[in-house]
A protein has these predicted regions:
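Membrane-embedded architecture of ER/inner-membrane glycosylation machinery
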Residues: 2-19, 23, 172, 191-569
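Extracytosolic helix-loop segments that constitute the early lumenal/periplasmic catalytic or substrate-binding loops
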Residues: 47-77, 81-84, 88
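Loop-to-helix entry region of an early transmembrane alpha helix in multi-pass inner-membrane enzymes
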Residues: 80, 84, 93-116, 120-121, ...
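Transmembrane-helix motifs of polytopic, lipid-linked glycan transferases
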Residues: 105-143, 160-161, 184
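Hydrophobic/aromatic residues in alpha-helical transmembrane segments
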Residues: 118-121, 165, 185, 296, ...
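Transmembrane and membrane-interface helices of multi-pass
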Residues: 148, 156-161
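Specific aromatic-rich, kink-prone transmembrane helix
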Residues: 164, 177-194, 347-350
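Short acidic/glycine- and proline-prone juxtamembrane loop motifs at membrane-interface regions
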Residues: 164-177, 216-218
């Protein structure tokens, strides 16, 4: 028996969000963080280092590309495609484009495609019969296409509003590639009921891409879940049986091919580690998925009568499966934040289906909390920036000097102009939201998304020099280079993948692993690995010159040694 839908939506509540405004808003969120910054520690710099290594190994054939290594060390994430894309982008980019920016271009595209695929996935889910609002006795209910478009707009705004999306979606790491291909699979399964070719191509791209980006097990689970959903739906849908069979066979074949690809390339790895710190994991869930998690819970509550018949309500079944898989992965794997990133499209989808059932008081609570939180964050960013430029107020300026010793602030007219424009746009948006306008179900997500975009833009403009100084390895490498000169040959011991990549990129150093032979005039050692140095090198050949500290990190020291024997070559 079909349960009555809790969505009661009139046609006037699904008015169109202007396309130009939506596109410009998405660009304002996507571009800051990709333009004008240094590669950051650790994952961002590490991934870029593997891309540089692949670019330098073009002459060694394709076999080197199947097992990327950085000075003989394999990547922590068994991914291939993200490193390939970055290396290809640097290879094809003209010489006047900086290598690190060229490597980011495919990731700009992947973040864009993530937003697009999520929008279309929700659009198709919202057109399914079980998602439709209550039909009014005398007409006037929302038309299916307009209703679906309004919910898709709401889901896109909800996804951008997620606090956990901002940083990880602007790094050149396998995590963003996994997010992109997850959204491809999501759209592919969601759209198969209405179309065949494009969703199947999207699902194929997503399954193969996720497998090659370090997530073959997740891809397999997504494929199995989509297949089960299609099989259950076939029992209730009699129209176009041949189309449904082709859809099921196609998805089954694609899932099997993705699993076979992972086996052929030896990408299957099991890193299941039960969580040791449940409170920390709980805090991660609370802030990382804000503000979609309370709305997702509201959806489950308001649609609770439909949860027992999920096969007839694909708009609930599909995001619930994707969210369950990714949240389970978050709990059972060490990279919890990067695993939880993959849950955001599904949680944003569930949040979107809360919008037609949201009470006026709850919508007002969301607006007021968002207004206060993001306005306070923006005000803090401006105050600290003013303190960096003028020394007033004194306390924020003193805090910056203490946390980032040696940082010299600079003024950029372009950055200031962008930040000022974003702040004025936020003020206008708040004024518009407080005004009397026709109701639209996506309006409750405007301030959360706008506030998240505002603060991210301010951080990536006003605070970018400070963040580059604090999160880049460049100051550390420059300190070492001032003592060794450049270019120089360095032997290394105990350095992390990110540190190795940074010394190669920022310092143009030739790096060699430390051994009993003094092959270079200089040796650098991570302070945490100093206790094992005697097992690797003959310290009689070296004289300690200095301890170099990364300015913004008291726990990251590099020991610099100089060769004293004349036996090296």
């Amino acid at each position: 028996m079909t349960q009555p839908t809790p969505a009661i939506v009139a046609q006037g509540a699904v008015r169109r969000l202007p396309r130009l405004a939506l596109i410009l808003f998405c660009l304002a969120y996507i571009l800051p963080g990709y333009i004008g910054r240094e590669p950051w520690k650790n994952a961002d710099m590490t991934a870029f280092g593997y891309m540089l290594e692949l670019l330098g190994e073009r002459s060694q054939g394709f076999s080197a590309w199947l097992s990327p290594q950085l000075m003989g060390i394999p990547p922590e994430v068994d991914a291939l495609l993200p490193y390939w894309l970055g290396a290809w982008a640097m290879q094809l980019a003209p010489a006047w484009i900086a290598p690190d920016f060229a490597a980011r271009l495919p990731f700009v595209l992947m973040l864009t495609l993530t937003l697009v695929a999520t929008w279309y996935g929700v659009y198709h889910l919202a057109r399914s019969p079980g998602a439709q609002p209550v039909a009014f006795a005398f007409g006037g209910e929302a038309r299916p296409a307009d209703y679906a478009r309004a919910l898709a707009d709401g889901s896109l705004l909800a996804l951008i509003a997620c606090l956990g999306l901002a940083q990880l979606s602007h790094e050149t790491t396998p995590a963003l590639a996994q997010l992109c291909f997850t959204s491809f699979i999501f759209y592919g399964v969601a759209g198969m009921r209405f179309r065949s070719a494009v969703p199947l191509v999207s699902a194929a791209t997503g399954l193969a891409g996720l497998t090659l980006s370090g997530g073959p097990a997740i891809a397999l689970l997504f494929g199995i879940g989509g297949l089960v959903l299609c099989l259950l739906e076939q029992r209730d849908i009699d129209e176009q049986p041949m189309h449904r069979r082709r859809e099921i066979v196609g998805l089954l074949a694609l899932t099997a091919l993705a699993a076979g690809l992972a086996w052929w390339l030896d990408l299957w790895r099991w890193r299941i580690t039960p969580p040791a710190d449940w409170p920390s994991l709980g805090r991660l869930f609370l802030w990382f998925t804000w503000p979609v998690w309370p709305l997702a819970l509201w959806t489950l509550w308001r649609w609770r009568r439909q949860l027992g018949q999920l096969r007839g309500y694909r708009h609930l079944a599909l995001p619930l499966w994707f969210a369950s898989v990714t949240i389970g992965t978050t709990v059972l794997t060490p990279s919890s934040d990067r695993s939880l990133l993959l849950a955001l499209p599904a949680l944003a989808t569930l949040a979107a289906f809360a919008l037609p059932t949201l009470e006026r008081s709850m919508a007002a609570l969301v607006d007021w909390f968002t207004l206060l939180f993001f306005s306070a964050c923006a005000f803090t960013i401006w105050v600290v920036w003013t303190a960096m430029q003028t020394g007033i107020p004194r306390q924020p300026a003193a805090n910056v000097a203490r946390l980032a010793p040696g940082f010299e602030p600079s003024f950029s007219t372009v950055s200031f102009g962008v930040a000022l424009t974003a702040t004025l746009a936020w003020i206008w948006l708040v004024k518009w939201r407080a005004g009397r306008h026709r109701a639209a179900i996506w309006k409750s997500m405007v301030l959360p998304a706008g506030g998240a975009a505002l603060c991210w833009t301010l951080l990536m403009t006003l605070w970018l020099p400070l963040l580059d100084f604090a999160r880049s390895y460049a100051p550390l490498v420059q300190s070492v280079a001032s003592m060794t000169g450049r270019p120089a040959c360095l032997q290394v011991h105990g350095l992390s993948r990110g540190q190795l990549a940074a010394f190669q990129f920022h310092g143009k150093f030739t790096l060699r692993p430390a051994d009993r032979q003094a092959r270079c005039p200089w040796l650098i050692v991570d302070a945490d690995a100093a206790t094992t140095l005697l097992q690797t090198v003959d310290l009689r050949l070296w004289e300690r010159q200095a301890t170099v500290r990364r300015p913004s990190d008291d726990n990251e020291d590099i020991l610099l040694y100089r060769r004293v024997a004349a036996t090296a070559h």
